């Protein structure tokens, strides 16, 4: 390799980081947004996409469609009527405020709906699903789940498996409807 070839290679590698840093600004770090076009949650195109590693994903104050993919993720929907699919891994999900749709995916997940009228679905793992406040629909699905309605008039089902359904608020006892048909 001649000296001029070596210098050209260095110049090419030096220009690339500068172009990324100056020409594209922070958008150079938006790889999840580029991937969002290929991922869907409950039929909606994702606006925020995690990776196959362990991610800490924060939604916005508006409506988000979040797909966690693999890994043991921590997902916070924050505000808005969010649609969240946690994906595989042992995930922790908090829907935040708003009327959210949350699906845990495979793995042993911990899901809290937050405030609002939420629809929450565990999946094949041993999940802890909790509606919190609002008129929620909470489903453990398969696995040995802990299912809690929270405050409000809730519809709760453990699904198949050896489940525990917990009533946290005595004043709410007459409001909730338990639906296990397995």
Question: Where are the regions that the model predicts?
Answer:
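C-terminal segment of classical bacterial N-terminal signal peptides
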Residues: 22-33
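N-terminal segments that cap or nucleate solenoid repeat domains
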Residues: 35-81, 181-182
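Short, low-complexity, Pro/Ser/Thr/Gly-rich segments in the mature regions of secreted, periplasmic
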Residues: 160, 164-182
């Amino acid at each position: 390799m001649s000296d001029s070839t070596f210098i050209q290679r260095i110049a090419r590698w030096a220009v690339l980081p500068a172009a990324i840093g100056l020409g594209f600004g922070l958008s150079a770090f938006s790889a999840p947004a580029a991937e969002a076009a290929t991922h869907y949650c409950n039929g909606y195109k994702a606006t925020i996409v995690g990776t196959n590693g362990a991610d800490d994903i924060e939604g916005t104050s508006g409506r988000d469609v979040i797909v966690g993919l693999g890994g043991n993720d921590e997902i916070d929907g924050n505000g808005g009527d969010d649609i969240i699919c946690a994906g595989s891994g042992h995930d922790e999900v908090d829907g935040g405020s708003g009327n959210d749709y949350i699906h845990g995916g495979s793995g042993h997940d911990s899901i809290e709906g937050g405030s609002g009228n939420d629809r929450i679905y565990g999946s094949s793992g041993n999940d802890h699903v909790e509606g919190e406040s609002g008129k929620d629909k909470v489903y453990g699905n398969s696995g040995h789940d802990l299912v809690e309605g929270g405050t409000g008039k809730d519809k709760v089902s453990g699904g198949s498996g050896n489940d525990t359904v917990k009533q946290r608020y005595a004043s709410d006892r007459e409001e909730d409807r338990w639906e296990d048909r397995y």
